[in-house]
């Protein structure tokens, strides 16, 4: 992909950061995150990513352009608080889709955590949903399932 204007949310995350860095070489990439770590922001900016501090839980995209070609939504919350995790993992995806309604494509990154654990069987898109992260992250699976419903 070259010459596109791309928004990447959760830009400081382990999945989004290498994608943002790679795409910034040939595109106008905007990275949205809380940017609580100044070094993470600096690394992205040095690669040419335009960084915008955004609190996805608040659903406020003021100051963030809407004229992107593509949105890659990698934002995630695993706080254990239902209000925050549903706001970030589900509600904000819908609000962001509305804010950037003219995009060519909106990629929403979900998680294998949305599936019911099938023992040793491989998972597919048709696998049954389930709350398989309850012991470790009690809000994660359900809030990610909610996000899939919002963007469907």
Task: Please identify what each model-predicted range represents.
Residues 135-152:
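Active-site Tyr-X1-5-Lys
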Residues 49-90:
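NAD(P)H-binding glycine-rich loop region in Rossmannoid oxidoreductase-like domains
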